[in-house]
C-alpha cells in the first residue's frame, strides 16, 4: 500500500498533463490505461535503493546542471571490450573526476551491420558481445557507489529489420505491420522524397526500402536495415515506454539521451 501511495503522490504532479497529451495525440483511453498501469508496475518493482535515489533527485531537480558535472562518452567495446572489463576501469574513471558516463548503444543488435548499435534487435537485452543485463546492473551499481551516473542511448526512432516486431510484420501480422510506415506503392514515398532530406545519400540513398516478403515499401530514414517506427500508433509508444521502464529497473538512473 505504501508503494502505491508513493507512486500516486509522484504521478499526481504529471497525471493531468500526461493524460491530456496522450488523448490529444491518440484519442485512445485504453492505451492510456495500459501506459499508466505499466508505469505503476515499474515503480512498484524498483528497489529501495532506486526509490531513495528518486526522492533525492526530486528534492534536487537541478542536480545535473551543476558546474562540477563532468561527463565522458564511449563505446564499451572500444574502451574496455565488454561491461565486466569496463567495471574494472572504475579506478581510472574516478581518477578523472567523472560524474556522468554516457555509453553508446549496447542493446542487442545484428552483426555485422548495425550502424554502431543504432539498429536494435531487442530493447530489453544487452548485446551478448558486450555482456548480460546482470553485467549492466552490476556496473551501474558500482558506478553509483562512486558517484557516477550512467546514461545510455535509447534508439527510439527505429528498430533493426531483424527485431521481432519487424519479423512478425514480414510474416504478414497486421498488428506489427502497423508498428511501421508501410506503403503498397510509391505514391506517398515519392511525395516524401521531394522534401525529406537523405541522411546517408552516398551509402544509403533514399528514405524507403522495398520489402519483398510483404511486397510493401518501408520507411527507412537511415539504412535499409533500420525500420522507422510509427508513433501514430499508441501501441508503439506504450511498448517503447515499457522498454525504457525496464532499463530503469536495471539500476540505470538516466536511461535515455
Q: Where do the PLM segments sit?
A:
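Acidic/aromatic-lined carbohydrate-recognition and catalytic surfaces
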Residues: 1-238, 245
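Residue-level detector of conserved catalytic or cofactor/ligand-binding positions
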Residues: 248-256
Amino acid at each position: 500500500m505504501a508503494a502505491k501511495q508513493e507512486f500516486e503522490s509522484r504521478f499526481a504532479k504529471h497525471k493531468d498533463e500526461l493524460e491530456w497529451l496522450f488523448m490529444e495525440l491518440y484519442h485512445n483511453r485504453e492505451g492510456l490505461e495500459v501506459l499508466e498501469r505499466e508505469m505503476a508496475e515499474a515503480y512498484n518493482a524498483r528497489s529501495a535503493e532506486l526509490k531513495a535515489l528518486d526522492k533525492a533527485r526530486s528534492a534536487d531537480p537541478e542536480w545535473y546542471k551543476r558546474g562540477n558535472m563532468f561527463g565522458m562518452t564511449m563505446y564499451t567495446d572500444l574502451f574496455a571490450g565488454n561491461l565486466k572489463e569496463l567495471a574494472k576501469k572504475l579506478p581510472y574513471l574516478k581518477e578523472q573526476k567523472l560524474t556522468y558516463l554516457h555509453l553508446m548503444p549496447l542493446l542487442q543488435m545484428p552483426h555485422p551491420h548495425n550502424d554502431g548499435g543504432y539498429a536494435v534487435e531487442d530493447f530489453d537485452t544487452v548485446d551478448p558481445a558486450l555482456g548480460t543485463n546482470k553485467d549492466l546492473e552490476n556496473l551501474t551499481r558500482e558506478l553509483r557507489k562512486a558517484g557516477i551516473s550512467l546514461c545510455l542511448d535509447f534508439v527510439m526512432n527505429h528498430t533493426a529489420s531483424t527485431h521481432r516486431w519487424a519479423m512478425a510484420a514480414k510474416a504478414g501480422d497486421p498488428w506489427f505491420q502497423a508498428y511501421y510506415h508501410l506503403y503498397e506503392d510509391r505514391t506517398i514515398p515519392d511525395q516524401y522524397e521531394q522534401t525529406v532530406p537523405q541522411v546517408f545519400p552516398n551509402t544509403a540513398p533514399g528514405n524507403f526500402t522495398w520489402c519483398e516478403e510483404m511486397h510493401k515499401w518501408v520507411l527507412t530514414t537511415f539504412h535499409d536495415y533500420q525500420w522507422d517506427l510509427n508513433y501514430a500508433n499508441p501501441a508503439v509508444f506504450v511498448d517503447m515506454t515499457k522498454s525504457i521502464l525496464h532499463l530503469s529497473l536495471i539500476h540505470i538512473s538516466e536511461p535515455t539521451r
